């Protein structure tokens, strides 16, 4: 039986559930390992503590998730969108108590630079906005000028500082909005235009999970540096005295949901934005003795925008996802992953700037080295330096990724930042989830929230 894409789930009693994806769907069958002798189980390899490859005497090869449960990489994109195209993340908008200070923090600590400004001096009488940029990454921090701004005031009271809007750069915005309307999406603001001497920009805003929005931006007729109404920001003389970080672009943005809300949200992206499922894991894999989660990664047809959707699963104690939802007051953005092509230099310099990261015990690297000894994958970075910096490593037969997570970016235990480098690896660090969970649980315990 040829294998296109398979998953094997540990069913207990020395049995594995084999799921074989074929054109017509997914076939599942029970494989009882007790039926095979040691000779028939001619060989196996352990990768990342997750994948085991069995080579049977018949030549049948099974790449199995033996210990941790069900992970799926989707090869079928489904039906091609009827029109419209998502090009990339455009920018991320934060609603915060003090936009100037928040922007300054991300510049001083994370390596961003002042990029754009919109405020009283530019004719914006109610909202101030400070935009910061690092390569292709743009964050915009907004605050209210006046005490009577009920919408922003309620948002800050409920959520604290957090992501209000994940903006996408798109083509054919008319079709995207038309399909979203047909599928029942809540349109916060229908298509409108803004213009200045550099051209016209077309926008529309949709409601996604919680109080989070997606603004669609068509820049095809605009040549300005950012958005109409913004002027270029003044230089921060502190920047030239600090080490460069070299973060390149937004890799993915993760949204946390309340229990049993992951599937409805994933369905919303499938129907309203014509996204498809790219990758998923369940709570049999992503767990510790205390807590667990489930995750589905949604992406556009071109797979340039990736949006993981998480939900908590029942556990002995409060999971990191549940803690987030309780402190944020609803579903919202848990973390933003920023891609770099030199994570060692990036993290060394971030630490010099005073950024704090989740700790990883040394035994993680001891076990990693043992697994790498039996793997074909070769890590080109110095493992000693990766260990010193507490950078996590995940890999499969095709390549590997390096990742690290900051501590929370504000007092509430909500948003944090991930720094990631990919070497021919399109996953999301499933092999590191246990180490990550345990590191987060240590922080939860310090807060009295575990």
Would you name each region that the model predicts?
Residues 3-11, 18-23:
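Short alpha-helix boundary/capping segments
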Residues 44, 87, 93-138, 182, ...:
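Core segments of cupin and vicinal oxygen chelate
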Residues 66-220, 225-231, 259:
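An N-terminus-focused feature that recognizes amino-terminal "leader" regions
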Residues 68-100, 163-166, 223-266, 329-339, ...:
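N-terminal beta-strand motif that seeds the catalytic metal site of vicinal oxygen chelate
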Residues 83, 96, 335-450:
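C-terminal functional regions that serve as terminal interaction/effector modules
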Residues 89-95, 112, 132, 139-141, ...:
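Short, structured motif recognition centered on aromatic/hydrophobic residues
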Residues 116-128, 145-165, 170, 174, ...:
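A cross-kingdom feature marking solvent-exposed beta-strand/loop segments within repeated
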